[in-house]
A protein has these predicted regions:
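Active-site-adjacent structural elements that line small-molecule/cofactor binding pockets in enzymes
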Residues: 1-290
Length: 290
C-alpha cells in the first residue's frame, strides 16, 4: 500500500472564538500528517501572522508536521527566512515543511511599501530564496549573487539537523521549471490547477528535474483541495463535495495524476465536524485505494 500524506489547513483568521491551536491539536489527535496555513498579512479582516501562529501551534503539539502554504517570498528577506526556518524546525523537533511562492498579492506588497514584482522577478526571486536557504543551511560561509537577492560570507549556526523539505506553489511554465530544478515538493491548488491541467504541469516539473540531473521521484506532489463532506452538498466550482464515499472516490482519483499528498481546506462553518468526518470517513477510504 502506498503511503499517502494528509494535511489540514488551519485558518489564520483572528476573529472572536478562533482557536488555531485547538484546530491543530484536533488534527493531530485524528491522525493528520501535517497542518498548514497561508501567508496573507494585509486587509481589514482580522488575521494572525503566519510564522507567529504556526510557532504557537508547534509549541502546543508534539507529532504533527507544520507547513507554510505558502510564504510570499517578497515579504521577507530570504536569508532571514532561512534562519527563521532553521530555528522553527529545531525548536519543533524537526517538523517544519517550508512552503514558498513568488507572491501573488501585489496589492498587499504595495500596501506595505514593498515593490510589486513582475512575473519574471517573482519566479526568479522564489528560486533565489530556495538556493539561499539551501546554501546557508549547508555551507559554513555562503556568498550568493542573484539578480534580486544576495548574501556575502553569510553564516548561520547551528545548521539544520536534517533536510528541511521545501514545497513550492507554482503554476506558470517558468515557475514549474524552477520547481523541478530546486524544490522537494509541488503544491498547486485545485481551483487554480484543475485536474485536466495537472499532467502537462507535472510533466514540465519532472522534465526540468531531469534536465537538472535530479531524480523526478524526489519531488512530492501535493494537491491543495477545498472539501466538504455533506450528503446535502450542492456542487460548487473549485470544491470537492458530497457524501463521504463520493469525496473519497474523487480524492482517490487524483492519485492517478501523481499526487502523493493532499492538503484539505474546509468549506463551511462546522470545522470540527468536517475535520472528524474527513479523518474517519474519507481518509481511510483513500488510503485503502492507494
Amino acid at each position: 500500500m502506498t503511503t499517502i500524506q494528509f494535511g489540514l489547513n488551519v485558518s489564520t483568521a483572528a476573529t472572536p472564538g478562533a482557536d488555531p491551536v485547538a484546530d491543530a491539536r484536533m488534527a493531530e489527535e485524528l491522525g493528520f500528517d501535517f497542518v498548514s496555513a497561508n501567508d496573507h498579512l494585509h486587509g481589514t479582516d482580522p488575521r494572525f501572522e503566519t510564522w507567529t501562529m504556526l510557532s504557537w501551534i508547534a509549541a502546543n503539539t508534539s507529532r504533527i508536521r507544520v507547513a507554510t502554504r505558502v510564504l510570499g517570498v517578497p515579504y521577507r528577506n530570504p536569508a532571514v527566512t532561512a534562519k527563521m526556518a532553521e530555528s522553527f524546525d529545531r525548536l519543533s523537533g524537526g517538523r517544519l515543511i517550508l512552503g514558498m511562492g513568488g507572491g501573488a498579492s501585489d496589492d498587499e506588497f504595495r500596501a506595505f511599501g514593498l515593490e510589486a514584482r513582475s512575473p519574471r522577478d517573482k519566479v526568479d526571486g522564489m528560486e533565489e530564496a530556495v538556493r539561499i536557504a539551501r546554501g546557508l543551511w549547508s555551507e559554513r560561509s555562503f556568498t550568493f549573487g542573484g539578480r534580486l537577492s544576495r548574501t556575502e560570507s553569510a553564516q548561520i549556526e547551528p545548521k539544520p539537523s536534517h533536510h528541511i523539505p521545501i514545497w513550492l506553489g507554482t503554476y506558470g511554465d517558468r515557475a514549474l521549471a524552477a520547481t523541478g530544478r530546486v524544490a522537494d515538493g509541488w503544491i498547486p491548488s485545485f481551483d487554480y490547477a484543475p485536474p485536466e491541467r495537472i499532467p502537462a504541469m507535472r510533466d514540465r516539473i519532472l522534465g526540468a528535474a531531469r534536465d537538472a540531473g535530479r531524480e523526478p521521484d524526489e519531488i512530492t506532489c501535493v494537491y491543495n483541495v477545498v472539501v466538504r463532506v455533506d450528503e446535502r452538498a450542492v456542487p460548487e466550482p473549485g470544491v470537492v463535495s458530497g457524501p463521504p464515499a463520493a469525496v473519497a472516490d474523487r480524492i482517490a482519483g487524483f492519485l492517478q495524476l501523481g499526487f502523493a499528498a493532499f492538503n484539505f481546506i474546509l468549506a463551511g462553518p462546522d470545522r470540527d465536524e468536517q475535520t472528524a468526518r474527513l479523518a474517519r470517513e474519507v481518509i481511510p477510504a483513500v488510503r485503502a485505494a492507494a
